[in-house]
């Protein structure tokens, strides 16, 4: 099956209903989202920002991301309520090499909008795109303290693959446990079509 991410993106924007009854729009990040996207990161508590691999408080970093969107490598889907970007999930892909069949998922939701199911909807959307793109697996990386996020991913079928104690350092050089979770996207051919 031939798959084009650009073709898949034509189904956006999507309107979704959150647990609290409010509606959110899911859509790809756009070049002109720079200021609103930066505001999302500024709204994340400093303690949590230490776990983000990039200096997201620097507008230049966000500007570069928005300017150079390459959906084949990094596909960010944002969650918007009203006109405010309140969450993002990204599918990170390697286009060659021995991990080309594995995508990586990252997700972030503004604290004021957590607990409404937005992160779940964003990750499900990204996993669906990954599956349709022919990826066989997706992974998600965590710092050991991110219990709520790991629980949400587990409810979506991700399982713990690796847990390394005191393995990574945050932006303040403090060591933390590293956890890698994964989801198998490949349908077992033996069971394909069963029950239908």
What are these regions (language model features)?
Residues 1-20:
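Short acidic N-proximal helix/loop "leader" segments that mark the beginning
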Residues 22-24, 82-88, 176:
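Glycine-rich phosphate/pyrophosphate-binding loop shared by adenosine-nucleotide-utilizing enzymes
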Residues 24-36, 158:
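A short beta-loop-alpha structural element at the N-terminal edge
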Residues 47-54:
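A short gly/proline-enriched turn/hairpin at secondary-structure junctions
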Residues 54-101, 106, 110, 184-186:
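Acetyl-CoA-dependent GNAT
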Residues 107-109, 115-132, 151-155:
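Conserved acetyl-CoA-binding loop-helix of GNAT-fold acetyltransferases
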Residues 139-142, 154-176:
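Conserved catalytic-core motifs of GNAT/GCN5-like acyltransferases
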Residues 166-196:
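C-terminal "cap" of GNAT-fold acetyltransferases
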């Amino acid at each position: 099956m031939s798959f084009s991410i650009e073709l898949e993106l034509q189904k956006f924007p999507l309107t979704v209903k959150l647990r609290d009854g409010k509606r959110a729009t899911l859509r790809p990040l756009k070049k002109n989202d720079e200021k609103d996207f930066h505001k999302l990161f500024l709204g994340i508590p400093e303690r949590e920002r230490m776990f983000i691999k990039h200096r997201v408080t620097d507008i230049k970093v966000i500007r570069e991301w928005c300017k150079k969107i390459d959906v084949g490598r990094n596909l960010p889907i944002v969650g918007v309520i009203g006109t405010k970007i309140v969450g993002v999930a990204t599918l990170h892909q390697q286009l060659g090499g021995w991990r080309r069949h594995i995508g990586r998922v990252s997700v972030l939701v503004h604290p004021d909008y957590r607990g409404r199911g937005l992160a779940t909807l964003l990750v499900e959307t990204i996993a669906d795109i990954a599956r349709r793109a022919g990826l066989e697996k997706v992974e998600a990386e965590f710092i050991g303290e991110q219990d709520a996020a790991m629980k949400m991913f587990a409810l979506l079928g991700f399982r713990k693959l690796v847990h390394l104690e005191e393995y990574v350092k945050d932006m303040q050089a403090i060591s933390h446990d590293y956890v890698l979770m994964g989801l198998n996207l490949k349908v077992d051919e033996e069971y394909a079509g069963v029950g239908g």
